[in-house]
Every structure is written in structure tokens, then in C-alpha cells.
């Protein structure tokens, strides 16, 4: 296990690991304990009472955060004809078909999200083994396989984030930057928490949300007491 730096150790002393904080207090503490010299990302981590090995307990989707993430997403769209023109007009960073598939096969990944029209998925599927492990494969559940390319691009540019439960039952999602006002981070957090609650699988038994924490890129995690705020 890597040894933590002196700044991290000092910052961690400010966090009571036995305590779950009010969400506003937790956000303020995450900003205070950030040790990065850059505008670090603030992330929320959920530990859920689900068994991801079972198909009926998979959790995956996307949501537009009210205040965005602070990161400009580079969007690659696989489309042809009028849909390609629509994508360009909507602000896609890259639009094409087989030409970009060839570039990706050669190791090009200067993008963050892929949107594909359904008729292009046969071609995109050819690079599924490359895209899948990187979390870049478009999927109908996240709204990235669609003929509504203008809407998809608009949502991504506005701050849409994807979430997916991992093998251990955890979900990690960015909710902004440490430079954000506290209120904006709290609002994004609440939206994300509400979304995860609504995504609860019917087959999930027992306690669903076991633990919630917020953290910055290079800072300590801060547990959140979810009972201290109102979820819609």
C-alpha cells in the first residue's frame, strides 16, 4: 500500500472517521482537506446493498447534474447523413463513422464520451473490446445509443454523468470541482443521491444505501449522514 504524503496525513486529522457529517458540513470539509494544487474533482461514493453478479441487481444509468461537473466533455458521435449534420450543429467535437473506428483501433482516445445512432452500432461493436474496459461503449441505458443526437449531446455538455455499480457494489461519480460554491456541490450531491435511490432494484434486499462518502481527488473521504437533508 502506497504511503500517504505529509499534507494528506495532516488533512486526514481534520476528519473524524467515526462520524457521519451533515452534507453541507461534509462538502465544506472536503474542500478544506483538499491537498491538490489543481482544481480537484469532488466525487461521491456509494456502497450499496446489492449483488452485482445477479442481472436483476445491476444498476446503470445517467443523470444531468444541475450545476455540471466543471469538466468540458469531448463528444465523439458515430452517425451518417442528416444525423451527422445534426451532431455537428449540436456541438459534437468529432463526428464520423468508420474513419474514427479505424483511428480508435490505432490507439486514438482524445474524447470522453461516445454517442452512436442505433444503425451504427454494428460498426461500433467491432471495437467493443477496446471501448468496454475503458467505460466508453455507448449504451441505450445511458442515452448514448439514440437517434436523438442533438438531445444527447446537449445533456452531456450540460453536465450529464454516467453511473454504474462495480463488482463490489460501489458507485463512484464526480459531482463537481473544489472551486464550486458549497451550495452547488450540495445540490449536485442531492440530485445524485436521489437518482441512486430511484434506481434501487426490486430484487435488492435489506439495507440499500449502506454508506455514502464524498472526497476530492487527493483528499481523505468524508462520510455523509444522508438523513440530514431532504431527498425529493
UniProtKB/Swiss-Prot annotation:
Keyword check for Repressor: yes
GO molecular function, one term: tRNA binding
Function: Binds directly to 23S rRNA. The L1 stalk is quite mobile in the ribosome, and is involved in E site tRNA release. Protein L1 is also a translational repressor protein, it controls the translation of the L11 operon by binding to its mRNA.
InterPro entries per UniProt: Ribosom_uL1_bac-type (IPR005878), Ribosomal_uL1 (IPR002143), Ribosomal_uL1-like (IPR023674), Ribosomal_uL1/biogenesis (IPR028364), Ribosomal_uL1_3-a/b-sand (IPR016095), Ribosomal_uL1_CS (IPR023673)
Gene Ontology biological process terms from the UniProt entry: regulation of translation; translation
CDD domains according to UniProt: Ribosomal_L1 (cd00403)
Subunit structure: Part of the 50S ribosomal subunit. Interacts with RNA helicase CshA. Interacts with VmlR. In stalled ribosomes contacts MutS2.
Species assigned in the record: Bacillus subtilis (strain 168)
Gene3D superfamilies: 3.30.190.20, 3.40.50.790
Family stated for the protein in its record: Belongs to the universal ribosomal protein uL1 family.
GO CC term (a single one): large ribosomal subunit
Residues making up the signal peptide according to the UniProt record: none
Keywords carried by this UniProt record: Repressor, Ribonucleoprotein, Ribosomal protein, RNA-binding, rRNA-binding, Translation regulation, tRNA-binding
Name listed for the protein in its UniProt record: Large ribosomal subunit protein uL1
Tagged with keyword Repressor: yes
A Pfam cross-reference name: Ribosomal_L1
Amino acid at each position: 500500500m502506497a504511503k500517504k504524503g505529509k499534507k494528506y496525513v495532516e488533512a486526514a486529522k481534520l476528519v473524524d472517521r467515526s462520524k457521519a457529517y451533515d452534507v453541507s458540513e461534509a462538502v465544506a470539509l472536503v474542500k478544506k482537506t483538499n491537498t491538490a494544487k489543481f482544481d480537484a474533482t469532488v466525487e461521491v461514493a456509494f456502497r450499496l446493498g446489492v449483488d452485482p453478479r445477479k442481472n436483476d441487481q445491476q444498476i446503470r444509468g445517467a443523470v444531468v447534474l444541475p450545476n455540471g461537473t466543471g469538466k468540458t466533455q469531448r463528444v465523439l458521435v458515430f452517425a451518417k447523413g442528416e444525423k451527422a449534420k445534426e451532431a455537428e450543429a449540436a456541438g459534437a467535437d468529432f463526428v464520423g463513422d468508420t474513419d474514427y473506428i479505424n483511428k480508435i483501433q490505432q490507439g486514438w482516445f482524445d474524447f470522453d464520451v461516445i454517442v452512436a445512432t442505433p444503425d451504427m452500432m454494428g460498426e461500433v461493436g467491432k471495437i467493443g473490446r477496446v471501448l468496454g474496459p475503458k467505460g466508453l461503449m455507448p449504451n441505450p441505458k445511458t442515452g448514448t445509443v439514440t437517434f436523438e443526437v442533438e438531445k444527447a449531446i446537449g445533456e452531456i455538455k450540460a453536465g450529464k454523468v454516467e453511473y454504474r455499480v462495480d463488482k463490489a457494489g460501489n458507485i463512484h461519480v464526480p459531482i463537481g470541482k473544489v472551486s464550486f460554491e458549497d451550495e452547488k456541490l450540495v445540490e449536485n450531491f442531492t440530485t445524485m443521491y436521489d437518482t441512486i435511490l430511484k434506481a434501487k432494484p426490486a430484487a435488492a434486499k435489506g439495507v440499500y444505501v449502506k454508506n455514502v462518502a464524498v472526497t476530492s481527488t487527493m483528499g481523505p473521504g468524508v462520510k455523509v449522514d444522508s438523513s440530514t437533508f431532504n431527498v425529493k
